[in-house]
């Protein structure tokens, strides 16, 4: 499911990690994935692909330099929220992808009790580091992470009433 760009709702009665034919066909489309690891077994995941933003909670098992649908299992206890992106948001994503697709940044300083960000562009890791040190990230990466979070945050708050 992580590489999917479809707008279908997955079943809610089990952990989801399989791809439909339509989703497999969309795997080659340009995408950005932000994994926010809070130090427990679950991560918040934001994916922007073409005109669709997907937000959910899941488990990232083996992703390192690349990520694929087999590396992520969505936690069925939480809904997967999807939103169509507007034209300006789509353009922002396209520009960010073109700027970041050949980037590589890793902040090696470990910050305990802090959110770890990992950013993938077209399924390849381009950045990782901790939220407390985001000011040390290259400007384009900072902007992209903040933008993806700002688009997903209202969806989460609307869904959970937080």
Task: Outline where the language-model segments fall.
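Acidic/histidine-rich, surface-exposed loop or edge segments in extracytoplasmic proteins
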Residues: 61-81, 128
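Extended intrinsically disordered, low-complexity coil regions enriched in Ser, Thr, Gly, Ala
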Residues: 46-47, 58-59, 65
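Sec-dependent bacterial lipoprotein signal peptides
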Residues: 1-3
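Short, solvent-exposed loop/hinge segments that bridge or flank secondary-structure elements
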Residues: 40-50
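Short, well-ordered, aromatic-rich surface patches in folded extracellular/luminal domains
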Residues: 6-40, 104-162
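Short hydrophobic/aromatic-rich beta-strand segments that constitute the beta-sheet cores
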Residues: 53-57, 128-129
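Short, internal acidic amphipathic alpha-helical interface segments
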Residues: 77-112
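Hydrophobic/aromatic beta-strand elements that line small-molecule binding cavities or substrate pockets
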Residues: 44-46, 83, 117-119
């Amino acid at each position: 499911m992580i590489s999917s760009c479809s707008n279908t709702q997955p079943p809610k009665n089990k952990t989801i990690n399989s791809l439909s034919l339509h989703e497999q066909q969309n795997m080659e489309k340009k995408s950005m994935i932000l994994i926010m690891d809070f130090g427990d077994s679950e991560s918040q995941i934001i994916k922007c692909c073409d005109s669709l933003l997907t937000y959910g909670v899941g488990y990232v098992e083996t992703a390192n330099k690349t990520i694929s649908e087999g590396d992520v299992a969505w936690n069925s206890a939480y809904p997967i929220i999807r939103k169509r992106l507007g034209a300006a948001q789509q353009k922002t994503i396209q520009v960010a992808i073109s700027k970041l697709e050949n980037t590589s940044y890793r902040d090696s300083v470990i910050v305990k009790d802090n959110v770890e960000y990992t950013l993938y562009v077209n399924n390849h890791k381009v950045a990782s580091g901790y939220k407390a040190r985001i000011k040390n990230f290259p400007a384009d990466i900072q902007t992209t992470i903040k933008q993806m979070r700002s688009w997903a945050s209202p969806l989460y708050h609307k869904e959970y009433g937080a």
